[in-house]
Each structure stands twice: as structure tokens, then as C-alpha cells.
């Protein structure tokens, strides 16, 4: 059967095109007269048709006006401001395609608006801030294109980072892969990386991260950070990736308490038994042991962590490192340990999620009276046990938790 033609009253591009250019022009002018932001967008589109110089001039007018404004923006007017900024951003992106260096300069001016806007815009939901963070990749894409066309442009961008390091630290972090290692290195060459200006250390650290400059990144770590187990773990992982195993050990040991000289407990085994440091530190120390060829010790720490936390990822890593067939026996041992774990709620959650429903049902039968706190997933667990272990499911539903 032949398809019916589109209804002429339906609002779509094809039907609007049928109205003709003159009619559409009149309609757009009527809409623009009632919507200043639409009017500015149309002006930018027309300017782009005239060329890069005309578009740059039109952008400069509006960017200057927004920067000069001191009026407060209420929550009612905030959506219009976001629209206006978005239209400007689209215009800057168009200019970047036509003239990369000119586009980058306007993109930096657009980002410079952020500081003033934070002082006069009520933005409890962070819509304005989100707009700038979302545009961060466009900044670095424009910068990369401009610097490739004219390397001298990197000087202006580096000066912007130097002048406003806190803001640019934010845009560097939000830029992701759009900030290329080559561009990051060019900026670092032009920055005072030892500057004590507030925010500069963060900006330089993030640039060093993007530039794969591990030594510079490490040099920016404070004594407090080096003493933090989680940060020490980050340092160690980066050093291990670079093949610097000895330094990775030093990084981890730098976070030890009470003393790194107590080598017997280097990897977190306190004399009274429990592991003392953070999961990230422990995971990094396992990677270090593997890199040093201390496979048995790495496995020993994995097992100790599992015994303590009933962590499924840790157990999977432990089993994956065992020879063939040994993993079956080890899994039986792990499930038996889980069934006797001191925290019955943690034990039941682990067995249900693994999944090991037979062991979970047996645990319910033996230890359900030990439940002292609510079990948010009780109904779901009972439903999963009901078919094969109906008595355990009933007891679970009847439990006080």
C-alpha cells in the first residue's frame, strides 16, 4: 500500500521549506523581534556567512556587553542567560573553524566571563557552572587547532592560565582527552611551574598529568599528600606503570604508620592482626608485590583482605592468580569462611551476590537470629531463594531485619 503523504499542517522542516524563503524570512523576523536571544543568534549566523572578520566583530560586541554588565541575574532570568551564553559559544565554535587563532582568543574571552557571572548570578543548581565545564573540551580543541596553525598562540593561552590559575585548573580537569599531551607540554614550557600563586599548583599538576610528565607531577606532592595512604597508592601505581618499582615501594612506605622502618609490617599487617591501611593502599601494595616477583606474599595479602572484608573483587583476583584446579578448593574455603564471618549481614550479602545460594540458605537456617539491623534487600534475596530453598526464604522474610 502506498504511503500517505505527510500532513501539510505538521510542523517539520519539509513543510516549512514549502512556505518559501520570503515567507520564512518574515516569520523569523517576527520571532526574532519577540526573542532578543534568537535575534542575536541570527545576527551571528549572518555574520558567519560574511566571513571570519564579520563574525569576530559581532562576537566581540556581545562578549564585551556581557563582561561589562553588573546587574544581578535572578533565578527567573538565569535560563535566558544560559541560552545567551550557549548561543555565544556556538558562534565562537564557528569562528574557530573559520579562523582558529581568532576563535581561540574569543573562546578565552568567553571563559573569562565565568568569574564575573559567579558574583552576580543566582545559580543554586550549578547550571551556569555546568555550561562552562561542558564547554571545556571545546576550549582545548580550539587551542590545539590554533597552536598547530600558529605555535605563538600558545603564549597567550599560557598567560591566561598564569593570570587565572584556579579557573583554568577547573577547565583543564574538565577538558579530558581534548587537552592533548603535546598542548599540555607546550603550556608547561611557558608557565612558572614553581609559582606559589593560589591554584597554580593544581593547574600545573593537571597539565603534568595530561603531558605524562611523571617527575613534575610527583614534585608537586605535598608532605601531607605523601603521608596519605590513598594518595600514596596513586603515586605508587603511576610509578609502577613507568617501571619505577623501587620508587613505588618508597611511595607506599611513605604513608606507613608508625614507622616505615618496621619492615615486618611494611604492607599493613599490624602486630595485633587486622590490616590497618586503606583498600586503595592495600591494592597498590599487591601490585607492587607482583612487580617485585613476590607472588606468594601478594596472594597472602589478597586472602587476608578477603577474610576481613568479604570483598568479591579481591576474591576473584585471588582465584584468578591460582593454578588450574586449585581455584575450586580455594573457592570452597572462601565460601566456608564467609559463612562464619562475624558480621552476618555482610556474610549473607556476599553469598547472595557471588552467587552461592546454597551456602546463603544454610547461613539463614543457622544464623538468622543474629540479624540486628534492617536488610534492605531481604525481599529480593528471599525471592531468589524461594524456588530451591523455600524454608530459608520464609525464615528470611520473617526475620526482624
Model-identified regions with their sequence ranges:
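Eukaryote-biased, non-catalytic alpha-solenoid scaffold regions
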Residues: 1-401
Amino acid at each position: 500500500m502506498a504511503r500517505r503523504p505527510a500532513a501539510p499542517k505538521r510542523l517539520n522542516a519539509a513543510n516549512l521549506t514549502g512556505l518559501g524563503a520570503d515567507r520564512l524570512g518574515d516569520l523569523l523576523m517576527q520571532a526574532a523581534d519577540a526573542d532578543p536571544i534568537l535575534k542575536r543568534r541570527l545576527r551571528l549566523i549572518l555574520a558567519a556567512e560574511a566571513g571570519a572578520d564579520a563574525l569576530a566583530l559581532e562576537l566581540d560586541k556581545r562578549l564585551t556587553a556581557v563582561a561589562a554588565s553588573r546587574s544581578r541575574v535572578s533565578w527567573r532570568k538565569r535560563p535566558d542567560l544560559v541560552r545567551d551564553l550557549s548561543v555565544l559559544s556556538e558562534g565562537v565554535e564557528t569562528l574557530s573553524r573559520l579562523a582558529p587563532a581568532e576563535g581561540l582568543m574569543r573562546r578565552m574571552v568567553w571563559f573569562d566571563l565565568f568569574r564575573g557571572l559567579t558574583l552576580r548570578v543566582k545559580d543554586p543548581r550549578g547550571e551556569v557552572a555546568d555550561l562552562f565545564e561542558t564547554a571545556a573540551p571545546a576550549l582545548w580543541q580550539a587551542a590545539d587547532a590554533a597552536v598547530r596553525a600558529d605555535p605563538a598562540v600558545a603564549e597567550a593561552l599560557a598567560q591566561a592560565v598564569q593570570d587565572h590559575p584556579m579557573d583554568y585548573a577547573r577547565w583543564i580537569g574538565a577538558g579530558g582527552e581534548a587537552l592533548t599531551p603535546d598542548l599540555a607540554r607546550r603550556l608547561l614550557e611557558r608557565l612558572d611551574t614553581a609559582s606559589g600563586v593560589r591554584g597554580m599548583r593544581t593547574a600545573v599538576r593537571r597539565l603534568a598529568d595530561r603531558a605524562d610528565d611523571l617527575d613534575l607531577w610527583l614534585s608537586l606532592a605535598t608532605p601531607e599528600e605523601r603521608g596519605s595512604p590513598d594518595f600514596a597508592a596513586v603515586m605508587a601505581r603511576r610509578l609502577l606503570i613507568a617501571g619505577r618499582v623501587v620508587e613505588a615501594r618508597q611511595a607506599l612506605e611513605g604513608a606507613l604508620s608508625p614507622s616505615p622502618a618496621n619492615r615486618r609490617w611494611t604492607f599493613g599487617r599490624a602486630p595485633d592482626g587486622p590490616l590497618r591501611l586503606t583498600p586503595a593502599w592495600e591494592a597498590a601494595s599487591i601490585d607492587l608485590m607482583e612487580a617485585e616477583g613476590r607472588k606468594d606474599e601478594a596472594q597472602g595479602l589478597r586472602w587476608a583482605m578477603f577474610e576481613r572484608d568479604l570483598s568479591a573483587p579481591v576474591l576473584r583476583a585471588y582465584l584468578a592468580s591460582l593454578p588450574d584446579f586449585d581455584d575450586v578448593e580455594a573457592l570452597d574455603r572462601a565460601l566456608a569462611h564467609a559463612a562464619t564471618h562475624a558480621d552476618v549481614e555482610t556474610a549473607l550479602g556476599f553469598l547472595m551476590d557471588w552467587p552461592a545460594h546454597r551456602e546463603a540458605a544454610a547461613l539463614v537456617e543457622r544464623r538468622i537470629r543474629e540479624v540486628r539491623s534492617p536488610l534492605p534487600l531481604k525481599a529480593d534475596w528471599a525471592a531468589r531463594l524461594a524456588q530451591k530453598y523455600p524454608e530459608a526464604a520464609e525464615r528470611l522474610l520473617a526475620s526482624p531485619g
